[in-house]
Every structure is written in C-alpha cells, then in structure tokens.
UniProtKB/Swiss-Prot annotation:
3-methylthioaspartic acid modified-residue sites: 89
Organism of this sequence: Desulforapulum autotrophicum (strain ATCC 43914 / DSM 3382 / VKM B-1955 / HRM2) (Desulfobacterium autotrophicum)
One cellular-component annotation, GO: small ribosomal subunit
Gene Ontology process terms (BP): translation
Assembly: Part of the 30S ribosomal subunit. Contacts proteins S8 and S17. May interact with IF1 in the 30S initiation complex.
Region Disordered, annotated ranges: 1-47
Function per UniProt: With S4 and S5 plays an important role in translational accuracy.
Protein's gene: rpsL
PANTHER family, alphabetized: 30S RIBOSOMAL PROTEIN S12 FAMILY MEMBER
HAMAP family (UniProt xref): Ribosomal_uS12_B
GO molecular function, one term: rRNA binding
PROSITE patterns: RIBOSOMAL_S12
Family as reported in the entry's similarity comment: Belongs to the universal ribosomal protein uS12 family.
Protein name as annotated: Small ribosomal subunit protein uS12
C-alpha cells in the first residue's frame, strides 16, 4: 500500500480498457479485400456452417469477418466494408461484414430488420 507522499508524487494509474476491435484503428468501419471465403463450425453446444471471410484491411491487418444473413455473393478479391462486433460461438471472429455496401449484396427477400442486412424495401 502506497504512502500519502507516494500518491502525491505519482498518483493512481487508471486501468486501461482493452480494445475489442484493434484492427479498425479507432474508426467505425474499414474497407478491405477478401483473401479467402470459407465456412466454419461453431463452438460446443451449437452446430452449423457459419460463413466467414478472411479480409485484408486498408490498415494492413488481416482479420476474420462474419458474413451475416442467408446467402452471399462474396468471393476472393471482393471489396467489403468491415465493422466491429464479434460472433460469440466462433473463436477469433471479432468483426462483421456490412451487407449492401461495396461488392456485398443485401439479403434477398428480407422483410424485417432490413437495415441490418442492406435489403431494399419490398414493393
């Protein structure tokens, strides 16, 4: 335990919060190019084939990003917009791809929650 004099001289150090999306360099989104598009299986109680892409960002980092929604048109060399947000049952996937921007199409036939999947309003 420090003395009063030591606290006057140095003060207490604030514990720094670890950043959850370091590859975005403090920004809301970053553009990147897909280097690999693949499926991955989730952690223990769940079972599925989750769509994931390896993306090289403009910051120079390469990250794994989840492709949300049903069906996608992404291939190698597709240009995508990446936002933060992890996928709880996929270890190492801490980013999401934004649907409906750049080379990523929106989800077809989406009626509810359209803004999250880049779907246009149905006529």
């Amino acid at each position: 335990m420090p003395t009063i004099n030591q606290l006057v001289r140095k003060g207490r150090k604030k514990a720094e919060k670890k950043q959850s999306t370091p590859a975005l360099k403090g920004g809301p989104q970053k553009r990147g190019v897909c280097t690999r598009v693949y499926t991955s299986t989730p952690k223990k109680p769940n079972s599925a084939l989750r769509k994931v892409a390896r993306v090289r960002l403009t910051t120079g980092m390469e990250v794994a990003a989840y492709i949300p929604g049903m069906g996608h048109n992404l291939q190698e060399h597709s240009v995508v917009l990446v936002r933060g947000g992890r996928v709880k049952d996929l270890p190492g996937v801490r980013y999401h791809i934004v649907r409906g921007t750049l080379d990523t199409l929106g989800v077809e036939d989406r009626k509810q929650g359209r803004s999250k999947y880049g779907a246009k309003r149905p006529k």
